UniProtKB/Swiss-Prot annotation:
Residue ranges of the region described as Metalloprotease: 65-963
Cysteines joined through disulfide linkages: C758-C765, C795-C831
Region (Interaction with TGEV spike glycoprotein) residue spans: 717-813
Pfam families per UniProt: ERAP1_C, Peptidase_M1, Peptidase_M1_N
Quaternary context: Homodimer. Interacts with SLC6A19.
Cytoplasmic side: 2-8
Name of the protein in question: Aminopeptidase N
Cofactor requirement: Zn(2+)
Source organism (scientific name): Sus scrofa (Pig)
Family: Belongs to the peptidase M1 family.
Sequence intervals crossing the membrane: 9-32
Length: 963
């Protein structure tokens, strides 16, 4: 699943607006982590009761009863399912949308058992008498059913038998049921959109991780693989899709010719969370790939007619071919459908053969979409198609190893997208998009290892917590590091061996290490200091990462667990004492040096890192290692001198690294904050995107801490001075903003130039924004603002303006036909400086007719990113937490993002007290998947308070001196 924030799976890059309006997203990251699923606790009518049916909600779980444990017993394994579903796309007499279903699951008994336990959630069983009918297969004798019950807390349907099922025998269990086709974005749900003035309704799915059980009774764990025969009964004017192609043409339903029956081919052996089925009037654009695979892009008819699916169609074939070669394994299905949904809480979902997307992750309009929208489409597609092998063909055994699934896809998405767009240098974007982004979380004492013990991940909420930036971005970072020190060819060799060995099966991360080790052992050119497992265990089984410190006078090199707050208490022990086996590359005076391994010791010495008086050395070339680097002050000063005299000697990524690392080290009190600020002085001569992005990203923290204090004025003045040469460069290059640079990185650099100039008050930029927006308001049918610049221009113009500008943008949002344009407007509306407008906007997030449920939390976070909106958003969340939690479901990963977003500025004792009181006040409601984020927010707030006290005066003086 893509980072929905994935989140937010990168994918794009975050542009920082350090202005009066806010810190706003300019280059959107592929739905960075705000995602997965919404579990809406909506009311579902109960089935008629009978003496043989009981509904149990266990309060105190008696663990001796298997139905009170969250993990399924292994006494029964599913072999196959036959599932028929009929969604009703108009409400019934009670005003509810429902679906009806029938399921036959064939079971293989592994051990004698007198109870059948199968997942079921919010389903009402309509079978007469007992909830199910049980039959033997072949000569298998079936005992009578004693009683059936629903256990609400553990989400089970339990069938108690009067005798035992026998090992080696097959049985079939049949049930009929109905459920609500709710708008809760989970399981089998409904999505709505407007076509003109007509409301259209479609039925779609989101099963990951634990909501297949909301669609039909099933063994809803990833290792419980089976084959599926899906049949959909649907209105005859609509199209039915599922994982596999239809067996033939749809046939009329015998009892009602207005309905059609579509039966699909049997799936391969697969996990329940990868199932998908959709009923809609969507249309598609199609092509057949060279290998015979049918590729189709589905969307609303208007979007297809306007060509918004063509870019996705054009890149899908090359990406599929790339991964088939990368994995040395053919694409395992006969077709690849991808569909853009109006309502979808994840960024995208890798359902096997029927991938679902948010519209802004699949659709692209060359006339109205920005370059970052285009980059997002190609990277999200690459992420999801990577899963068709790694995750779908070979699947994790349990959710505690989610990082292997999502981390791997989050790494190779850059490779697949780079193949589709070879001139963009997309592979470099993993550094700002994933590596440094996740280090900010992984450097907290409240972080967690990539691999979590299976026994700690049981409930749906615990599973949802696995879908975080550690799993996605740290997973991607360490797999990239592994591929780099093995070499990509050797890595691919081991990967292909792994996929061939475990096709249609389940694995743990140890299985991948074993096959990579076999590839290492079969050659002699790559020599490792230890086994793949021994090296990687230190990166996956302990949280955090090291800071490597070099003393260039002696050549001494040491490592230490890096913590942003060096005084924080690390309560999680490590079998490796927080030491790592670290692959180190280095440059001395612009020349590459031999590779070096720092073993799992705290200190070593090597002359590679020793310099003469005028020399400098720089470690972690292109940031292929997952660590940060500190030097003695003389070496830092020599690097600064090199950057200010001839910056091209240092690779672009490492120019960004110097900024990222030094600011993080300053936060951790390992270097003076003035040294980090000195590392930005060279930017007045820098034209490349990544160093500027590093500075803006790092300084965004300064903005959050100081935009309510006297530091902010001198800080803005300094940034105006530094960015003005870049602004003038692109003003000339683009012929006064009438053209766009040719390559991706230059376009991103242009966006940073104009966003930084406008948000820090450069008059010519503010005038540009006002002029362009005024032109648009005077002629709404002709938008003169290039899509690349719209986020910046919209935000700045709304910040400068008042109600007229806000209402105009809101009106344009209501009319927007392209979701990318709607996203830009929705974010920009949060830039207003009018308190009453922001409060009104917050209220809109509680009304799904005004702000879609999938967009509610990101809208609140956009308002919170505005210095004026932040206290309003915090008050709003406090006042409405119970409603938000109940309406959206505590399992939704977006709660983690919401807590992070509204507390980012917290840096005072009063705000800390408020946060602690918020925790206390809502213990009865709970925080669901936001529980860890709340603890991290408390930790960050304490660190912020301390940092501001220690650094405010010196930072103020530095900005005054250099502005």
């Amino acid at each position: 699943m893509a980072k929905g924030f994935y989140i937010s799976k990168a994918l794009g890059i975050l542009g920082i607006l350090l202005g009066v309006a806010a810190v706003a997203t300019i280059i959107a990251l592929s739905v960075v982590y705000a995602q997965e699923k919404n579990k809406n606790a909506e009311h579902v009518p109960q089935a008629p009761t009978s003496p043989t049916i009981t509904t149990t909600a266990a309060i105190t779980l008696d663990q001796s009863k298997p139905w009170n444990r969250y993990r399924l017993p292994t006494t029964l394994l599913p072999d196959s399912y036959n599932v028929t579903l009929r969604p009703y796309l108009t409400p019934n007499a009670d005003g509810l949308y429902i679906f009806k279903g029938k399921s036959i699951v064939r079971l293989l008994c592994q051990e004698p058992t007198d109870v059948i336990i199968i997942h079921s959630k919010k389903l009402n069983y309509t079978t007469q008498g007992h909830m199910v009918v049980l039959r033997g297969v072949g000569d298998s004798q079936v005992p009578e059913i004693d009683r059936t019950e629903l256990v609400e807390l553990t989400e089970y349907l339990v069938v108690h038998l009067k005798g035992s099922l026998q090992p080696g025998h097959m049985y079939e269990m049949e049930s009929e049921f109905q459920g609500e086709l709710a708008d809760d974005l989970a399981g089998f749900y409904r999505s709505e959109y407007m076509e003109g003035n007509v409301k259209k309704v479609l039925a779609t799915t989101q099963m990951q991780s634990t909501d297949a059980r909301k669609s039909f009774p099933c063994f809803d764990e990833p290792a419980m693989k089976a084959t599926f025969n899906i049949t959909l009964i649907h209105p005859n004017n609509l199209t039915a899709l599922s994982n596999m192609p239809p067996k033939g043409s749809s046939t009329p339903l015998a009892e009602d010719p207005n309905w059609s029956v579509t039966e699909f081919e049997t799936t391969p052996v697969m996990s329940t969370y990868l199932l998908a089925y959709i009923v809609s009037e969507f249309q598609s654009v199609n092509e057949t790939a060279q290998n015979g695979v049918l590729i189709r892009i589905w969307a609303r008819p208007n979007a297809i007619a306007e060509g918004h699916g063509m870019y996705a169609l054009n890149v899908t074939g090359p990406i599929l071919n790339f991964f088939a070669n990368h994995y040395n394994t053919s694409y395992p299905l006969p077709k690849s459908d991808q569909i853009a949904l109006p309502d979808f809480n994840a960024g995208a979902m890798e359902n096997w053969g029927l991938v679902t997307y948010r519209e802004n992750a699949l659709l692209f309009d060359p006339q109205s979409s920005s370059i970052s929208n285009k980059e997002r489409v190609v990277t999200v597609i690459a992420h999801e198609l990577a899963h068709q092998w790694f995750g779908n063909l070979v699947t994790l055994a349990w959710w505690n190893d989610l990082w292997l699934n999502e981390g791997f896809a989050s790494y190779v998405e850059y490779l697949g997208a780079d193949h589709a767009e070879p001139t963009w240098n997309l592979k470099d974007l993993i550094v700002p998009g994933d590596v440094y982004r996740v280090m900010a979380v992984d450097a907290l004492a409240s972080s967690h290892p990539l691999t979590t013990p299976a026994e700690e991940v049981n409930t749906p909420a615990q599973i949802s917590e696995m879908f975080d930036s550690i799993s996605y971005s740290k997973g991607a970072s360490v797999i990239r590091m592994l591929s780099n020190f093995l070499t990509e060819d050797l890595f691919k060799e081991g990967l292909a061996s792994y996929l061939h060995a475990f096709a249609y099966q389940n694995t743990t991360y140890l299985d991948l290490w074993e096959h990579l080790q076999k590839a290492v052992d079969a050659q002699t050119s790559i020599r490792l200091p230890d086994t793949v497992r021994a090296i990687m265990d230190r990166w996956t089984l302990q949280m955090g990462f090291p800071v490597i410190t070099v003393d260039t006078k002696t050549g001494n090199i040491s490592q230490k667990h890096f913590l942003l707050d060096s005084e924080s208490n690390v309560t999680r022990s490590s079998a490796f004492d927080y030491l790592w086996i670290v692959p180190i590359s280095s440059i001395k005076n612009g020349v590459m040096q031999d590779h070096y391994w720092l073993r799992d010791v705290s200190q070593a010495q090597n002359d590679l890192f020793k310099t003469a008086s005028d020399d400098w050395v720089l470690l972690n070339v292109n940031v292929t290692g997952y660590f940060q680097v500190n030097y003695d002050e003389d070496n830092w000063r020599m690097i600064q001198h090199q950057l200010q005299t001839n910056l091209s000697v240092i690779p672009v990524i490492n120019r960004a690294q110097v900024i990222y690392d030094s600011f993080n080290l300053a936060t951790a009190h390992m270097v003076p904050v003035t040294l980090a600020l000195d590392n930005t002085l060279f930017l007045n001569g820098e034209k490349e995107y990544m160093p500027w992005q590093a500075a803006l990203s790092s300084l965004s923290y300064f903005s959050l801490m100081f935009d309510r204090s006297e530091v902010y004025g001198p800080m803005k003045k300094y940034l105006r001075k530094q960015v003005e040469p870049l602004f003038q460069h692109f003003e000339t290059l683009t012929k006064n903003w009438t053209e766009r640079p040719e390559n991706l990185m230059d376009q991103y650099s242009e966006i940073n130039a104009i966003s930084t100039a406008c948000s820090n008050g450069l008059p010519q930029c503010e005038n540009l924004a006002k002029t362009l927006f005024d032109q648009w308001m005077s002629d709404p049918e002709n938008n003169p603002i290039h899509p690349n610049l719209r986020s910046t221009i919209y935000c700045n113009a709304i910040a400068q303006g008042g109600q007229d500008q806000w209402d105009f943008a809101w009106g344009q949002l209501q009319q927007a036909q392209l979701v990318n344009e709607a996203d830009k407007l929705r974010s920009a509306l949060a830039c207003s400086n009018e308190v009453w407008l922001l409060n009104r906007y917050l209220g809109y997030t509680l009304n799904p007719d005004l702000i879609r449920k999938q967009d509610a939390t990101s809208t609140i976070n956009s308002i919170a990113s505005n210095v004026i909106g932040q206290p309003l958003a915090w008050d709003f969340v406090q006042s409405n937490w119970k409603k938000l939690f109940q309406d959206y479901g505590g399992g939704s990963f977006s709660f983690s993002n919401l807590i992070q977003g509204v507390t980012r500025r917290f840096s005072s004792e009063f705000e800390l007290q408020q946060l602690e009181q918020f925790k206390k006040n809502n213990m009865d409601v709970g925080f669901g998947s936001g529980t860890r984020a709340l603890e991290q927010a408390l930790e960050k707030t304490k660190a912020n308070i301390k940092w501001v006290k220690e650094n405010k005066e010196v930072v103020l003086n530095w900005f005054i001196e250099h502005s």
